[in-house]
């Protein structure tokens, strides 16, 4: 199992956000990308001093750039192995979110802030209050509630209620080391892929979720998040962990490759989202991997994790 000093930097906080539809609204695109677009636009307007079309004069201190356009130091050696730096947040709508909402219906999603992004909670709350339209025609919505959620202990506290001005600075943070203290379920686990999971290996996306591929992509994501957003790189035997992952067997594969098409208002064209959904069962010496898998449930894994793809749930299978 990873030592505390090796992984102590990894931390996150999770929030449940509820919007109320003031008028009926229809979503032509995946809810995660809709929310990310509306949220990013409002965040930039509120938090970045640059005018539209201009470069930010102080990107190293700008909350928008640190969260949405993360850039490494110019001399960062990590650029050689990281094609894209992950953003320190995840917008995760329910896997079966609706396409249409009536007046009074709730649009609910989870927002995970990772590492230093937790310090920007006030910026996120103010931005969410400014999101006043979603979907086709930007139908009116209002922020109804934000709750801090501890997914490890299954408790929650109110951060904001729509008819109040008070914002409570609640952070029910979860650390990697707290996940490492949770007992491994045994020699068999089941991973349920809840949203399209896009695992890239050997220059292509895999359609068979071999454990070593899943773990490689998860370890790479956690390593990047630690390096760029949590203050320090992970001090781990990466090669040794991957070699051990190759010994874990895929004993049941109930996944399928799925695709669905949604309109992208940002790109003004239809986009196809593809990936694995379903479940896979693995057997082997799994104890060392358990905390990574547990923590990774809230960071997601694979391409598109920032707006909700790569969501999974892990549990014992014995």
Q: What does each model-found stretch correspond to?
A:
Residues 1-318:
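RNA-interacting cores
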């Amino acid at each position: 199992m990873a030592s505390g000093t090796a992984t102590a930097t990894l931390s996150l906080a999770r929030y449940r956000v509820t919007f109320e539809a003031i008028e009926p609204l229809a979503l032509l695109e995946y809810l995660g990308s809709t929310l990310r677009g509306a949220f990013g636009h409002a965040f930039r307007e509120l938090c970045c001093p640059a005018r539209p079309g201009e470069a930010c004069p102080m990107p190293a201190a700008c909350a928008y750039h640190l969260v949405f356009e993360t850039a490494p130091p110019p001399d960062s050696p990590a650029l050689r192995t990281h094609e894209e730096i992950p953003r320190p947040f995840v917008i995760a709508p329910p896997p079966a979110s609706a396409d249409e909402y009536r007046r009074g219906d709730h649009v609910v999603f989870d927002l995970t802030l990772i590492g230093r992004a937790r310090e920007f909670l006030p910026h996120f709350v103010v931005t969410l209050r400014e999101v006043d339209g979603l979907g086709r025609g930007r139908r009116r919505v209002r922020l109804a509630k934000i709750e801090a959620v501890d997914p490890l202990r299954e408790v929650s506290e109110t951060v904001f209620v729509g008819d109040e001005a008070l914002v409570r600075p609640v952070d029910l943070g979860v650390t990697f080391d707290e996940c490492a203290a949770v007992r491994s379920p045994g020699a068999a686990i089941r991973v349920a892929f809840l949203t399209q999971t896009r695992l890239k290996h050997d220059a292509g996306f895999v359609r068979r979720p071999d454990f070593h591929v899943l773990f490689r992509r998860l370890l790479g994501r956690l390593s990047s998040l630690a390096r760029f957003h949590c203050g320090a790189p992970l001090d781990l035997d990466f090669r040794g962990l991957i070699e051990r992952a190759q010994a874990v067997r895929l004993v049941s594969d109930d996944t399928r490759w799925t695709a669905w098409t949604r309109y992208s208002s940002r790109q003004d064209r239809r986009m196809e989202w593809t990936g694995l959904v379903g479940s896979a069962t693995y057997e082997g010496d799994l104890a060392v991997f358990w905390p990574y898998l547990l923590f990774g449930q809230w960071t997601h894994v694979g391409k598109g994790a920032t707006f909700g793809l790569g969501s999974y749930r892990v549990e014992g299978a014995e």
